[in-house]
Amino acid sequence: MKENPLLTVEGLTASFATESGRLPAVENVSFQINPGEALGLVGESGCGKSVTALSIMRLLPRPAGRIDRGRVLLGDTDLAILPAERMRTFRGSRLAMVFQEPMTALNPVHSIGKQLREAFRLHEHIADKGLADGKAVNLLRQVGIPDPERRLKEFPHQISGGMRQRVMIAMALACDPDLLIADEPTTALDVTIQAQILDLIKAQQQKRGLSLLLITHDLGVIAETCDRLCVMYAGRIVETADVFTLFTRPAHPYTRGLLASIPRLENQRKTRLAVIPGMVPALSELPPGCRFQNRCPQARDICRDREPPDITVADGHAAACYFAGPEKEPHATG
């Protein structure tokens, strides 16, 4: 029997108020995450990955940002229309988020211990400081922080960037959420620490049976961590597949461009890396039809006239491209 998804995002559109009027940062975004599954959301900076995550968490900056339409179902509960007070109880207990920059996400004037105790007080109604500190010490130990009793008394500026991110992961896991959202969790960390943080997130996800939404621009991170992935471009999802399929048989020209631009150690020839020409269009200057058509080597008149629907390539594999269907060759010109 097929398992019901933990998270279902349907037709999500979120916009921001600008001098040019309201502009959609994400438009008609749809995907699902099953219980215990790790889904990657990948794309260039500004494509709408973080806005998607903030929309799920109902943390878009107000009043500029808002969800215009769509559903965000956590089980049977639509988070998009949940009253604010009830949504606050869901954050932390049902879903939690690890943000890009822990120094700005942590409160600089409160100790690590106080911030962890606050999570226990709000979501588990634990008022006893000794009991909360015991749980906090155990949690810090689980995320690999040495001497956790001492760390409880320290402030965010007193620990390293990698340690701060471990604290953020501990805070996100404090109340055993069903869904963990990690938004570029290794930003500004050196390569060695990046690998440790990603290993920690994956280990905790598997140990606790969490569902994971991992947001990144790094396809290598996706390959190591996720089961499936969605590729975003200019506010829309252009391809969805399991990791193996997408890396071996990408169907959308943008996905192929991303994969072609990855440096390969086995390539000993002194050749230039492949690049995707042009720039991602500004939200106020989106072209008609396919949003990738100005940069696409396969673009034809139909791409400029009409926005492509999601074409089913195979079971579990879809791409928003007129030339992605199974009846076409991978590089068909129509």
Where do the protein language model's features map onto the residues?
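ABC ATPase NBD coupling module
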Residues: L79-A96, L122, T245-P250, P281-P287
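ABC-type ATPase nucleotide-binding domains, specifically the catalytic core motifs of the NBD
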Residues: A17-S20, R58-A64, L82, M87, ...
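Conserved ABC ATPase "signature" region
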Residues: G75-D78, L131-R150, L259-A260
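P-loop NTP-binding/switch modules centered on Walker-like glycine-rich loops
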Residues: E44, I181, P185, L189-T271
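Short catalytic/signature loops enriched in Gly
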Residues: P5, P146-R150, T240-G334
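A short, proline-enriched helix->beta-strand linker immediately N-terminal to the Walker B motif
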Residues: A174-D178
